[in-house]
């Protein structure tokens, strides 16, 4: 194999790796964001339930217990 051919193969490998990497990152970002939102909602519900059942916390945090 000549130097020009090896360089061409190298460029193709780099280009392919870049394309595959960028598409997989974009796809996983959406899944991670959805999972983060569900986790945040679950944590907020647990905190509300725990705080609102204690009178002192309920009085100090009326914005949480509504």
Curated annotation (Swiss-Prot):
Keyword Disulfide bond tagged: yes
Tissues/organs with expression: Expressed by the venom duct.
A cellular component term, taken from the record's GO annotations: host cell postsynaptic membrane
Transcription regulation found in the keyword field: no
Signal sequence annotation: 1-21
Main location group: secreted
Substitution effect: residue 54 to D: Decrease in inhibition potency of AChR alpha-7/CHRNA7 (2.5-fold on rat receptor and 65-fold on human receptor)
Cellular location(s): Secreted
Cysteine pairings via disulfide bonds: 51-57, 52-65
Consequence of substituting residue 61 to A: Gain of selectivity for alpha-3-beta-4 nAChRs. Moderate decrease in ability to inhibit rat alpha-3-beta-2 nAChRs. Small decrease in ability to inhibit rat alpha-3-beta-4 nAChRs. Loss of ability to inhibit rat alpha-7 nAChRs
Job description of the protein: Alpha-conotoxins act on postsynaptic membranes, they bind to the nicotinic acetylcholine receptors (nAChR) and thus inhibit them. This toxin potently inhibits alpha-3 containing subunit nAChR. It inhibits alpha-3-beta-2/CHRNA3-CHRNB2 (IC(50)=10.7-33 nM (rat)/132.4-704.1 nM (human)) and alpha-3-beta-4/CHRNA3-CHRNB4 (IC(50)=47.3-97 nM (rat)/52.1 nM (human)). It also inhibits alpha-7/CHRNA7 nAChR with IC(50)=103-210 nM (human)/41-61.2 nM (rat) nAChRs. It is more potent on alpha-3-beta-2 receptors in human than in rat, due to a variation (Pro vs Gln) in alpha-3 subunit in these orthologs.
Family: Belongs to the conotoxin A superfamily.
Domains (record comment): The cysteine framework is I (CC-C-C). Alpha4/7 pattern.
UniProt protein name: Alpha-conotoxin RegIIA
The species this protein was found in: Conus regius
């Amino acid at each position: 194999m000549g130097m020009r051919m090896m360089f061409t193969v190298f460029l193709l490998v780099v280009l392919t790796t870049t394309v595959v990497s960028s598409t997989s990152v974009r796809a996983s970002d959406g899944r991670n964001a959805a999972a983060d939102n569900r986790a945040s909602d679950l944590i907020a519900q647990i905190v509300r339930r725990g705080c609102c059942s204690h009178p002192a916390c309920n009085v100090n945090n009326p914005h949480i217990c509504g």
